[in-house]
Amino acid sequence: MISLKGEGLSLRDILKKIVIPSVCFPWGIAAFLMFILHFGGDFPDIYSYAQPRLGAAFAVMLIVSFGLFSVFSKDYLKRLLPWAVILPLLWAGTFTWAYGFASLPEKKHLGDYYVLGALLFSLPYVYTIGLMKCGGYVRAALQVMYGAFSFFMLLFPLIYISYYWRFGGEMDLFALMAVRATHWEEVKEFLSTMGSPLVLGLAIGVLLLLLLAAYVLTQQVGRCAESGEGLLRGSGKKIKVGLIVISILFFGGFIRQIIHVFPINLYRTMNSKGSEFQLLQNFNTNLDKNTAGLKLIDPADGLDEGTHIVIIGESANRDHLKAFTPSYPEGTTPWLSSKVNDPDFSLNYMAYSNFPNTLMSLSYAMTSANQYGDMDLSHAVSMVDAARAAGYRTDWISFQNRSSLSSAGVTLIAERSDASFWEKNYDEYAVDVMKKLPPAKRRVLFINIMGSHYTYLARVPADQRGALGISENDPYYGYDLTAAYTDRVIRDIFEYAKAHMNLKSLVYFSDHGENMEHFHSTSPFFYDMVHIPFFVYLSPDYQAAHPSLMPVLKSHEKRPFTNDLAFDTVTGLWRAKTNFYHAAYDLSSPDYAITMEDAKTFGGKRMVKDDPALAK
C-alpha cells in the first residue's frame, strides 16, 4: 500500500480514506460533548462554547485525527480503538462532569482536558510502533513504562473524583498545600477516625484493581502490535517521515499538556516563583530582613508591667458558640456567656477569618500582612517581633504539630519567641506550662490550642465529655464538645493568669471557622468556614491606665473585623505600635475604618457583605 497520491492513492481515495474521516471524527466527538454539556446548564447556547481553550481542543482533535488517518491503516485504527479510547474517555468524562455538572469554577480549563484527551488517544498508536521496532530489554522497559503510565493516568482522575466525593469540591492549590503541610500525627489521627478496616480494605482493593487494569491495558495494547503487518497505511518514505513527525508531535504535545492539568498544574503553581507557597518558604528570610527596619512609633518608656495573652483557636465557628449566637441550642460557652455583659470584656459579633485555611490565615493573622492591599507576606513583620521590639518577653505554647513546612508559616513565627513550648497533650495542659514559665515583668504569651481541630472527639479527654453539658442527641455532638471544652480551657488560662501573672489583656480568636459537612476548604467554600469568635479582655487597672480602649472596643462590637487585622489590634492594645501599625485596622482605635463595604475574606477575593447569613 502507498501513502499519498504521489505514491499511488488517487485524490478520491485521499478524500475518502483520510480527509473526510479526519474531519468527521472530531466533529462527531465535539457534537456529542456539546450535547452532553448542554444538560449541565453552564453551556446553554452555541455562544457559550466560544472559548479559546475549547477551540484549541477542537484544533488538536483535528490534527490528531488527520495524523492517525494519514499514517495508520483503517484496520489497525479499528483494532486498537477499544484500548486506545479508555484513558481519554476517563479523563474527558471526569472533567466534563466536574466543569459541566459539578458547578466548579474556572470552566475555561475544560478545554485543557479535552486537549489532553485527544493526545492520550494518539499515544497507544505511537507507543505500539516503538514496541514493534524494539526487542529484548528495551521492549520490556517500554512495557513497564507504559504500564506505570497507565496506572497513574487511571489513578489521577480517581483521586480527583474521590476528593470531590469526600469534600464536595475540587482539590485545588490550597488543599495540596494543606496536604503537604500535614504532620504524620494528623495523618494517623485521620486514618484512625476515617480509615476503618472496611475503608482501608476498599482503598487497597481499588489500588489493586487499578494495577490490574493497567496491566491488562498494557498487555492488550502490546498484543495489537505483535504482528507488524497492517499497522501502517503503507511502507513508503513519506509514511515513515509522517510517522516520525506525528510521533514527535503527539508525544511532545502530551508532555507539554500534562503539566497544565491536574495534579501537575497544582504542583507547579505551588512551587512557582512568586506563589503564596514560595512566599511562605521565604518567610523566615523576609521576617529577618523586615524586622531590621522595625521602629516603635511610641517609645516604650512607660510600658505597663504585666502579661498580655493571645489565644489562637482552631476551627472555631462562632455560629456554634452560644456567647456569640444566643439562639444556639447547646450551651457551648458557659464561661464566656457569663462575661458577655462584663465591663472588662468585649466580644466582636462580626469577626471573620481572612482565609479558610490555617496555613494562610495565621500567616496573615500573626503578621502585619493583610488582604486590604497595604502589605503582603514578603514585606511583613510578626506580632512576636513587634512585642519584642517594645520590650516584652515573648513565650509561645503550642498544642499543634510543628508543620512539615519547616521554613514557613506559624511555626516560624512561634520560634521567633524568646521561648517556645511544643506540647503533645490536651489543651488544658496550657496552665501546667504557664506555671513553669520564668518570671518576667512584661510578657506577651501566645497559646495556640488544638481547639476544634478534626478529629473532634480526639480533642476532649474521654473522662470529661459527660461533664461538659452537651447533649448526646446533638447532631454536632463531637464538634460542640470541643467548643465547650475550649471554653473551659480559656477559663482556666484566664483564671490562672489573673491570679498569678498580673494579667493585663487577653485576646482570643480562631484561625478559621468550620462547616459541619465540608469542614474548611477553598473548594467548596461556604461563609461559615470563616465565621470566627473574637473577644478581648482588659483588666480594670489596665483600663484605668488606658481609658479609651474598652469604650472603643465596645462601640465596635457590631463592626466587621477580619483576623488579618489582629496584628494592628493587639499591638495597639499592648502600646507596641510600630511603623508597621495602621490605626485604620486597629479595632481598639477610634480611627478603625473597616465597614461592611470594605470587609474582605478569602484572601481579598470575597466580600463579607455577600455572606448569606447577613441576609437572615
Regions found by a protein language model. Give the residues of each.
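C-terminal luminal/periplasmic domains and tails of membrane-associated envelope-modifying transferases
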Residues: A389, P439-A440, E495, M550-P551, ...
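Transmembrane and membrane-interface helices of multi-pass
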Residues: I2-N265
